[in-house]
Structures are given as structure tokens and as C-alpha cells.
Amino acid sequence: MGEDSDDSAEADSHRLRDLIENSSDLIGAVAGGAIGLVGGPAGSIGGAAAGVAITKTIRRVGVEVYDRLLVARQQERVGTVLAVALDDAQARAADGEKIRDDGFFDSGEGQRSDAEELLEGVLLQAANAYQERKLRHLGAILPSLAVRPDIPPADGHWLARLADRLTWRQFVVLAIFANPPEERLSLRDIDQDVSGGMGPTGGLRQEVEELGTFGLLGVTNSNGETGPVGSTYDSASGIWGVPMVRWRLTLQGRLLVDVARLADISTTDRESVLNDLLA
């Protein structure tokens, strides 16, 4: 894709500011009022600190996808993710994180860059994300990958697809086991042994099993090493056959937590799901 002309870039910047302002109510709901990018001149939206490459990608792809959508709520969701992405990019740059220079933002003859393709995919997922609490975390994906040259673009697409496929409650479960409350989990396991309980039933049980199937949640072995569900004798029939204190994120699970900033999920949301897990 060719370079933007000054007039085109300015027009897109105005459109980006407008669409973010049109999404302000939803931005406040899912980001807690932490996003502050709509002020100032339209041409400077995102700020120089956000990085030229990522700002151009967000501006160009964001406006294009937004204008394709006909449903107002879908447009608001896309505007919210764009605001989050710009804010995260600016914060990372302010922290001194360097934008990757391995070709992630480079387009070829008749081909878009990996960054543009990934952002379009994330925005189209966001447009249909009826669990709108996920939007803050979908918006984190591009800025995270922009500073992670250790993650190949193909892996980035896989992570984005996983984030789209998971439910909000699965996001929260991953956040819990990013820093598991081991004492509470141990007490739960003792109670289950005494009472002969089987843990929660219904949807939550299935969602946790699915995290194991996806390779995001695993179990520790006798050496304390984390492996996939099925790698130990007691996990052969599924993760619920293993004491909860031994549940751990796999390498892939930790990667998704980092890229989608799931560690930012509130204590209130974690406690609610954790209480259901411990029931």
C-alpha cells in the first residue's frame, strides 16, 4: 500500500477522531474512562509518541473498516478498539518500548502489511463482539505485537483468532491462573477430597475444559513442570481430574495473557469467577 498523501492522512485523522468521539460512551464503559485520545488537533491523534508506523496502520485500516459497517453498535465497538489501541501504543512508546522493525509494518507490491491484515481481523472480530468487556483486550493485541518481534505474524493471527473465540469468562479464568491464589486452591482441593465433590457443573466446567483443549491451561507434573492436559496420569480424563492447585497456564496461555493484557482484568471480575470455580 502506498504512502498516504498529507491531505489523505489529515482527512483520515479527522475521521478517526470523529469515530472515536462517537464511541465515547462505550469507551467509558469498557475502559473505565482511562482512554484520553480524542482531545487535541485531529492531525495529531495518537501523538508522535505512539509511533508513525502503528498510528498510520490504525488510522488507515480503522477508518476503512468503520466505514464498511452499517450497524451503529458495530461501529461503536470498532471505535472503542481503535481508541484502546492508540492509547496502548502511546503508553508503550512513553515507557520506552521500541516498535519492531522486522517488516511487520511493511507492505509489498499489491500486498498489505502483516500489521494491517491483523488489525483488520481484530476490528471485524470486535464489530461482532457482543460480550463487550472483551473489547479492551482485543484493542491491546496490535500494540502488544508491535513491540514483540519474538512473536511471528502468523502466531499473532492465531492469538487474535483465539481471543475472538474465547468467552469473557474464559478470559477471566486465564487471568486468575496467571497468578493463581494457591492457598485458596489448596483449601478447595482438601474440601473436595473430604466431601467427594466434583466441582462446578454446567457452562463453566465446559469452558475450563475447553481452555485445556486449546492448550492454554495445563497441569504441573511431579517435577513441577507445566504440560498440556493429558500429559499426566491424573489428567488423562481431563483437567477436572487434577487438583486445582496444580493448574497452570501453558506457554501459549501466558502469551495470550500478555498480548491481550488479561492481567488488567479487575479483581472484582476475578473474584466472581473464582468463587464459582471454588464452589
Model regions and ranges:
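Eukaryotic partner-binding/assembly regions in large regulatory complexes
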Residues: 57-145
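Membrane-inserting effector segments that mediate pore formation, membrane fusion
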Residues: 7-83
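Long, helix-rich, hydrophobic modules that act as membrane-proximal anchors or helical bundle/coiled-coil regulators
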Residues: 120-279
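Short amphipathic alpha-helical segments, especially helix-boundary/capping motifs
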Residues: 5-8, 115-117, 147-151
